[in-house]
Amino acid sequence: METAIVAAASAIGAGIAVATGIGAGIGQGIAAAKAAEAVGNQPEAKGDITSTLLLGVAIAESSAIYGLVISIILLFVNPFFKYLGM
């Protein structure tokens, strides 16, 4: 019984961890839209805008990657099963 509860909680936790990708996707979309708007307003600043955009997108993507790593750990290398003797 405890094994089923731990497995279900791990699956729910993995789903919540993957949901961090939603926030990252929305943030990246907004950032790209604002960057395109800024390049349209000031084409001469394209290099600065692009480098700032890429740095911001990389930081936003890191939360999605961390969520993916946590979900993979919970699903395939579940550390909670060792406490149940499995």
Curated annotation (Swiss-Prot):
User: Short name of one Pfam family for this protein?
Assistant: ATP-synt_C
A Gene Ontology cellular component where this protein is annotated is: plasma membrane
InterPro entries, per the entry: ATP_synth_csu_bac/chlpt, ATP_synth_F0_csu, ATPase_proteolipid_c-like_dom, F/V-ATP_Csub_sf
Q: What is its main location?
A: membrane
What is the annotated localization of this protein?
Cell membrane
Statement: the UniProt record of this protein carries the keyword Glycosyltransferase: no
List UniProt keywords, sorted A-Z. ATP synthesis, Cell membrane, CF(0), Hydrogen ion transport, Ion transport, Lipid-binding, Membrane, Transmembrane, Transmembrane helix, Transport
Membrane topology type, per the record? Multi-pass membrane protein
Q: Where is this site: Reversibly protonated during proton transport?
A: 61
Q: GO MF terms on file?
A: lipid binding; proton-transporting ATP synthase activity, rotational mechanism
Q: List membrane-spanning regions.
A: 4-24, 57-77
Q: What does this protein do?
A: F(1)F(0) ATP synthase produces ATP from ADP in the presence of a proton or sodium gradient. F-type ATPases consist of two structural domains, F(1) containing the extramembraneous catalytic core and F(0) containing the membrane proton channel, linked together by a central stalk and a peripheral stalk. During catalysis, ATP synthesis in the catalytic domain of F(1) is coupled via a rotary mechanism of the central stalk subunits to proton translocation. Key component of the F(0) channel; it plays a direct role in translocation across the membrane. A homomeric c-ring of between 10-14 subunits forms the central stalk rotor element with the F(1) delta and epsilon subunits.
Q: Please give the subunit comment from the record.
A: F-type ATPases have 2 components, F(1) - the catalytic core - and F(0) - the membrane proton channel. F(1) has five subunits: alpha(3), beta(3), gamma(1), delta(1), epsilon(1). F(0) has three main subunits: a(1), b(2) and c(10-14). The alpha and beta chains form an alternating ring which encloses part of the gamma chain. F(1) is attached to F(0) by a central stalk formed by the gamma and epsilon chains, while a peripheral stalk is formed by the delta and b chains.
Family as reported in the entry's similarity comment? Belongs to the ATPase C chain family.
The protein's name is ATP synthase subunit c
Q: Encoded by which gene?
A: atpE
